[in-house]
Amino acid sequence: MSSITLPAKAKEHPQVRTLNILRDLPTVADLIELCFSPTMDQDGQRYLSDMRRASRDDKFLRWANHMTETTSLPLTGYVWEENNKIVGNASLIPFRDNGKRIYLIANVATHPDHRRRGIGRILTQRAMDHARNKKASAVWL
């Protein structure tokens, strides 16, 4: 009989790391497109285009690296990486509503070849933990 030990908490998964906007935006955009293109509307296509354009704009990336709590692009979040390839993503989009800090968890995506392993669940949990640690009054999915 064989068994596998799974970490009890999401933060114990070595494949999970924080999104690095300086290098991950194009790959995350590709993953989102792969996972959602059959149902993506014009707003979604525009969002992907904005992500890709932002990833090529050095001035924006330098600015955004310090503004992760105030913009709607996914400048913070978590990715799942295997063999130096991003195969999962959960973006965190912070905003304020009547002075309250709120996080939207968006673009939870897992590459089709890596599904049914709990990657999306673990990334979502990590994103929720992040929002909780930032004292968010609400988390929306």
What are these regions (language model features)?
Residues 1-34, 38:
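Conserved N-terminal entry element of GNAT/NAT acetyltransferase domains
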Residues 32-86:
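Active-site rim helix/loop that mediates acceptor-substrate recognition in acyltransferases
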Residues 47-49, 69, 104-107, 129:
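Basic, Lys/Arg-rich alpha-helical nucleic-acid-recognition elements, primarily the DNA-binding modules
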Residues 75-79, 85-94, 104, 109:
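Conserved beta-strand in the GNAT
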Residues 95-105, 115, 134:
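A conserved beta-turn-beta hairpin within the catalytic core of GNAT-like acetyltransferases
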Residues 114, 118-126:
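Conserved acetyl-CoA pyrophosphate-binding loop and the N-cap/start of the following alpha-helix
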Residues 131-141:
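Conserved GNAT acetyl-CoA-binding A-motif
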